[in-house]
Amino acid sequence: MMSGSRLASRLIIIFSIISTSFFTVESIRLFPDSFDDASSDLMEAPAYQNGLDCSVLAKNRLLLACDPSAVHIAMTLDPAYLRGTVSAVHSILKHTSCPENIFFHFIASGTSQGSLAKTLSSVFPSLSFKVYTFEETTVKNLISSSIRQALDSPLNYARSYLSEILSSCVSRVIYLDSDVIVVDDIQKLWKISLSGSRTIGAPEYCHANFTKYFTDSFWSDQKLSSVFDSKTPCYFNTGVMVIDLERWREGDYTRKIENWMKIQKEDKRIYELGSLPPFLLVFGGDIEAIDHQWNQHGLGGDNIVSSCRSLHPGPVSLIHWSGKGKPWVRLDDGKPCPIDYLWAPYDLHKSQRQYLQYNQELEIL
């Protein structure tokens, strides 16, 4: 875990190093021409090994995939966000004391599964992972247009189907978006207990205006809005969640989320923000509140409009570039926000090797 002041100091040093360097950043394709291009554009990550105090788990990936003693992390694999996913994985491995005890469950569309798995193996040769196919037809007919096209991607809804996509032997998982980096030991997040019958845990933001996540049509319909009558719902970001998959399956929460999507699609427009509102409708007011340090979100701002964001006060364990702006896009354009320099040391794109080259100088901080 890093304090806000420590991250600020690190940020100043990174910025100083980069601004005085002799190199220039070449123009980079955001979307590679092929998956082979994506693989060749990425460097192999350093090898990370368990510390002496780590439990010895199965070396066989098939066995580790079902081992409840392992830390299980689920992420989507979207070619457009592959660079972000790779950086997120890199940050997790770098900051955990037991990297060999982590198993990654990646979800990809059927057309890209094999190529993406090959890319991951080349970047992380010793990584324990499995790539699952998400059939986009499962949810495509339930998606209604939102305020941002990126939110309409079927893969964005895969988080609602983890209990069905992942092997039934997986009873608990951490779900992470692709635009995060972890600067603390992920085992701390994994060990958080979900009290009572709660199915998910996430940082909760009760100061946010909860009503804005739904339309006037929703709030004026007593039958629909009564879902919150016995609760005190608060906003939470679905980009970082600890999920009890056994409780999820028992509660059949995927169907409950789908039911709200059907109302949105077939009856009346009750929300505008893609996959988030159905989660709020089903779980709002009934989640395990996790410390805010595990999702310093909303840092994306905008790639085009100058709207850089700053870290929130307090300790930081996970930094999340949610929103339109992504650090790799701004860095490539030569117009980064200061916060983007905290993402850069985990970037494994070959054009960014300078950040990795100087990263050792930052270890003393």
From Swiss-Prot:
Gene3D superfamilies: Spore Coat Polysaccharide Biosynthesis Protein SpsA, Chain A
CC terms in the record's Gene Ontology section: Golgi membrane
EC numbers, comma separated: 2.4.1.-
Cytoplasmic compartment spans: 1-10
Transmembrane segments: 11-31
Record topological domains on the Lumenal side: 32-365
Glycosylated position list: N209
Keyword Signal belongs to the record: no
Biological role stated in the UniProt entry: May be involved in pectin and/or xylans biosynthesis in cell walls.
Family: Belongs to the glycosyltransferase 8 family.
Protein name per Swiss-Prot or TrEMBL: Probable galacturonosyltransferase-like 10
Gene: GATL10
